[in-house]
């Protein structure tokens, strides 16, 4: 058993809190999602494309994360998207202490129970990582020894019909990672204009048939608003048809999920907040699954990894005020062929790592 050296006082490491703080953006209160009768319309292959862990997806690129993040015994690592706790557990087993964050109360409950045997070495909080600064301030922590962001959606979220992420199991058209927020997929589908839906499906979903799908949705909702996942998925399938293994609603559902949870906005803000708390010599590792996410990470690391800035109209190069990172992975790392075969959901994963230099 690893050392269980106290990280901070016991009053700071309680897993259930009675207070709300940082303007109610952080909560450790567990809420059971409402029950929903799932109607399995197709094989889970449509969505999972593989046999998955029945609770949470297997952590992607785990050996690479440990090798490149270099967690030190006794240092504090922030697992900013702990999900099912796979990466969190590996970091704890390496000897590091972990602050585990997730905006999903289901994940918080699961990780709290799964990792309870690590005692004081793990702190679990419900919070979007864009608010990590509030959590660290509340705990009295100024800097951390490493950061991990795994931006993938979990199998449990996809497979729980009541959460509304699935296009093969009927449920409310919800898609909120944090059920205390107000915007749902139903609101978007039923209230966004045709032009807004087209832009959303094209930009976040990278859907070639974005305009046709948006037009169909607007036409259909005039007579009957969309309230459940399967009617929407079936309407898209009827319009587009099936080509290959991927369900034709995949990219539209992805776009809706990203919009509901402001995933790109959270990533842009979260990177700034988290890197500001990284100790010199410590590293941040980000696993992304979407080209837009990877572009944000790539550009952030590039902009913070340039010591000098230069423009043709300048008389001389100027120091970059944001220079505080060194690239560890000039090109993103991807899962091995073996990992992709064992876990097809890892296929689009990209890992980028940078080190704080000051």
Pin down the residues of each PLM region.
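S-adenosyl-L-methionine-dependent methyltransferase catalytic core, i.e., the SAM/SAH-binding region
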Residues: 2-5, 12-17, 21-358
